[in-house]
């Protein structure tokens, strides 16, 4: 997936790195709320997020950071589960490339679904919605 934003690579990277900002744009739609249960943005650090719909937890995502280069790249894994049952694992790579006065974001996802055949489509659709919401968040700042 690729998107171009009118903000600098540093601004787009910061929106990704700051857990409070990411909570605002990281949802696939306005129907989903993200709760940050833990946030440790560093190589080896772990984020734990609960995805809520109507106040009920529908999924838990545990992320572990493997590579962070400020304003350039983030590589991490996400373990996705529901009620303690593993649904899948994603490898996520986000590259922040200068593009004129803005940023071209290149997001590469590799997801393995363990349970639930709709997980792959859900992950892709969720990221697409989140990246659209990131544009709105960047425009608001």
Language model features: what each stretch is:
Residues 23-24, 28, 37-42, 48-100, ...:
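Hydrophobic-ligand binding "helix-grip"
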Residues 111-141:
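A conserved amphipathic terminal alpha-helix motif
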Residues 5, 109-111:
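Hydrophobic beta-strand positions in extracellular immunoglobulin-like domains
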Residues 1-32:
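Hydrophobic ligand-binding cavity/cleft-lining segments
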Residues 12, 22, 47, 65, ...:
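Hydrophobic pocket/interface hotspot
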Residues 1-10, 66, 97-104:
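Aromatic-glycine hotspot motif
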Residues 17-18, 70, 132, 139:
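Residues at helix-coil transition
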Residues 1, 82, 117-119:
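Short helix-to-loop capping/linker segments positioned immediately adjacent to catalytic or ligand/cofactor-binding
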């Amino acid at each position: 997936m690729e998107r171009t934003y009118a903000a600098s690579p540093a601004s787009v990277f910061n929106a990704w790195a700051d857990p409070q900002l990411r909570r605002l744009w990281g949802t696939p739609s306005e129907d989903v709320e993200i709760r940050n249960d833990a946030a440790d943005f560093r190589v080896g650090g772990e984020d734990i997020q609960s995805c809520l719909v109507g106040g009920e937890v529908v999924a838990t995502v545990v992320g572990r950071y493997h590579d962070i280069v400020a304003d350039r790249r983030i590589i991490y894994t996400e373990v996705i589960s529901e009620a303690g049952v593993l649904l899948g694992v994603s490898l996520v790579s986000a590259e922040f490339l200068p593009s004129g006065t803005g940023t071209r974001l290149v997001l590469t996802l590799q997801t393995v679904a363990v349970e639930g055949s709709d997980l792959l489509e859900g992950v892709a659709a969720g990221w697409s919605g989140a990246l659209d919401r990131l544009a709105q968040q960047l425009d608001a700042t």
